[in-house]
Amino acid sequence: MENLEINTNTTPPITIVDQLLEMDERTLAELLIRCTQTKFLKPPKGKTEEERTENYKKIEAEFNQEVDKILQIYKKHGLVKELMEWATGFTYDDISHYVQHEYDLLKRAAGFYGIKPRAMETLLDLERVIFEHWMQYLIEKLREELEKHPDKFDEIAKSLDEHLTSEEKEQLLKVLKDKGLVSKEISNLQGRALLETILTAGSGTGVLLGLGSAGFGVYIALTKTIHLIFTQLLGITLPFAVYTTATKTLSLLLGPLGWIIFSILMVIPFIQHARKKKTALLATVFVPTIYLAYIEKQLQKGEGA
């Protein structure tokens, strides 16, 4: 399995608390809601695409209201404290005291995927491994959903053609060619070819993880691709501006739709069991979000952002 080419050799070691403190307050508030409020787990209801889209807008409005409420109560340190208290099950006044429990919470998240931590593995190394398995799990779920709804394939391919810009398609095509995942004879990347590549290339994660090393622009294009795929599966239509104004991966993944997507596929099966739900949320929401935020910062720095 390919890894994102990001240097993790840092001194002193990066902690989860450090990473959370690097995130902006709104992102922290959105993450806190994702981890603690199960009322946003349900998909938007409706018999038609219009009804589902309208109900999604109501969910989005309520979600943003909850974020605003939290931001009126907590500043950054308070948000980090609330997140770490939820993640570890311990309560401390000084957020630095949560660091002693970080390995245990990562070990618990790793166990969701059957991962056993290796000797001499840093916290960031373990985060990366969890993130890789999260990606693999996500693509496997995508395959399962398309097997249930094969008629969606053409709709998704069309949506990719319409929403990805020419520049984004060129960026993706170049990386796919460099990795030998599509023929060098192809001059124009179509939505169908992109979707087939994501579904069939190795474990399904090689494309996703490998593209991350190609730069921030490609990373955003990739995220838009995944988001578009699942939006179509849910039968929701979003304004084109949602994708043209996206400036970072987390702006797509942490919003209410991202919350719904990942919860439906990954967390709902564990809702009836409180301990399993907590483990599922650590493995599919908490750790991947923190690592994605870290990746984004590294990629932005690499492009002089």
What would you call each of these model-derived segments?
Residues L222-A305:
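Membrane-engaging insertion elements
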Residues T53, E60, L71, A110, ...:
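Generic intrinsically disordered, low-complexity segments enriched for polar/acidic and small residues
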Residues M1-G204:
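Terminal export/targeting leaders at protein ends
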